[in-house]
């Protein structure tokens, strides 16, 4: 058995080596960047190098107090149900996904700010190209949006998307402040202080991303697997800009090196472990004031991405459409919306912007439901979908019933618009709980009826799931297979995981 395992382990390593060599060859061919496992270790690093070569001339990295100030303005994708309430609704519902949201945001950006950041107090300088500012919100009058514009960090450090923002002090960037002003009837605020740039923009980021998207589209049409490199680089391109400070590092020492290292670094040592081979692993603190990144660029991209989604999420409420309230859930770049509301939204968009909302171009929307990853009920068991795609009769999948418990916790009951009577598939998510754990719970206690399980979750019932097959790495490097019980409950204040 050991020889068998060794043989397949060696074969896996050979296959990985061949794949890496092919990836490296294509990276050199298309980008003249060598992912050589020395200077560049990851796709994010490769993408960042490409942006550095093309888009960051005359711009500066930031560090220290400026970096931490800008970081406090940085908020990830908006993920919530409408008004943060649980939802169970029967209707024709679409899951519309925006193509390449973050690359779209980079194309829409004015560029990367040139020059060094400068300090301001009390008044935002009119000559500012871009700024990050701390404000106190004095007065807000406008629609009570299902998907609020601003997230306020609560006592647990979780972003709470709320319309109740009067009296709050927040740090935001130019785009978010403009959105707060534009999407409300009245918005009054007091400026405290901030940082700004006033030397214009390096505008190459838009053309660089657009070239990558168009090149990927061409390769994809030709069936060239190199299109995946372009996809990876575009999706990873913003993350490396906001790399968090690395505040500690592991040092591995042979026995003869230990005493000298401890004597010279005793004030920075956090933890010491002896490894199975006799070496010593020392966790050592690193100074974070030497960490530089492009946090302001990462925050600008995230702000622009949410701005693009707001133009879809908020417009029907803003114009007081009778179909407002038919967007039920959003997760960063996608929305669950009723079919009739989507048709109206397309019309509103076309009249306002003169472009098509749905399509295959960068930034347009497309339906994201597909059969892969779905489940069916068979013999009172929830099993992976086994029906042939022909049973859809050429129709498109949509959700005929939606259950939303909270963030990243929902169930879609899918069917085909050409064969409603014979097709019923299930697509679900439950953050913090593996698919296998949900399926086991469903089959053991609900006879495969996953709708009944989600009804209990929406009702606020506490539910215990057993997570199995997990790997835990010990401080000494040993790896063990473990299982864990996790209790889930959804309340008015959000999900509780124990």
Predicted regions and their residues:
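Conserved acidic
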Residues: 1-498
């Amino acid at each position: 058995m050991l020889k068998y395992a060794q043989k397949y382990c060696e074969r896996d390593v050979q296959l990985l080596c061949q794949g890496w060599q092919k990836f490296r060859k294509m990276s050199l061919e298309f980008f003249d960047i060598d992912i050589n496992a020395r200077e560049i270790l990851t796709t994010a690093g490769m993408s960042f190098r490409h942006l550095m070569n093309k888009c960051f001339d005359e711009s500066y990295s930031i560090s220290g107090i400026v970096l931490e100030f800008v970081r406090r303005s940085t908020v990830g994708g908006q993920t919530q149900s409408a008004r943060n309430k649980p939802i169970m609704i029967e209707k024709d519902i679409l899951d519309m996904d925006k193509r390449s949201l973050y690359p779209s945001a980079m194309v829409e950006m004015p560029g990367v700010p040139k020059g060094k950041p400068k300090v301001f107090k009390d008044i935002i300088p009119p000559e500012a190209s871009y700024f990050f500012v701390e404000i106190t919100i004095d007065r807000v009058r406008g629609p009570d949006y299902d998907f609020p514009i601003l997230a306020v960090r609560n006592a647990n450090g979780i972003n709470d998307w709320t319309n109740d923002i009067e009296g709050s002090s927040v740090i935001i960037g130019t785009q978010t402040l403009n959105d707060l002003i534009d999407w409300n009837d009245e918005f009054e605020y007091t400026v405290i202080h901030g940082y700004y740039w006033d030397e214009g923009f390096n505008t190459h980021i838009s053309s660089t991303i657009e070239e990558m998207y168009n090149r990927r589209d061409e390769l994809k049409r030709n069936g060239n697997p190199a299109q995946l490199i372009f996809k990876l680089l575009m999706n990873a391109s913003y993350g490396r800009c906001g790399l968090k400070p690395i505040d500690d590092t592991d040092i591995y020492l042979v026995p003869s090196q230990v005493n000298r290292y401890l004597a010279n670094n005793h004030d920075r040592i956090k933890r010491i472990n002896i490894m199975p081979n006799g070496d010593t692993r020392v966790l050592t603190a690193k100074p974070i004031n030497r960490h530089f990144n492009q946090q302001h660029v990462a925050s600008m991209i995230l702000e622009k991405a949410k701005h693009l989604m707001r133009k879809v999420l908020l417009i029907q409420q803003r114009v007081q459409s009778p179909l407002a309230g038919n967007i039920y859930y959003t997760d960063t770049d996608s929305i669950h919306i009723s079919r009739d509301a989507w048709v109206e939204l397309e019309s509103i968009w076309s009249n306002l912007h003169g472009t098509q909302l749905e399509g295959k171009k960068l930034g347009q929307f497309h339906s994201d439901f597909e059969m892969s990853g779905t489940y069916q009920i068979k013999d009172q068991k929830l099993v992976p979908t086994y029906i042939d795609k022909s049973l859809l009769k050429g129709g498109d999948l949509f959700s005929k019933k939606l259950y939303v418990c909270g963030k990243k916790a929902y169930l879609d009951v899918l069917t085909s618009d050409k064969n409603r009577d014979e097709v019923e598939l299930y697509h679900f998510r439950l953050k913090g709980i593996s698919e296998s754990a949900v399926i086991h719970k469903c089959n053991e206690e609900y006879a495969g009826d996953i709708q009944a399980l989600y009804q209990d979750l929406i009702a606020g019932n506490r539910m215990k799931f057993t997570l199995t097959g997990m790997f835990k790495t010990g401080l000494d490097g040993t790896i063990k297979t473990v299982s864990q019980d996790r209790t889930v409950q959804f309340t008015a204040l959000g999900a509780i995981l124990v």
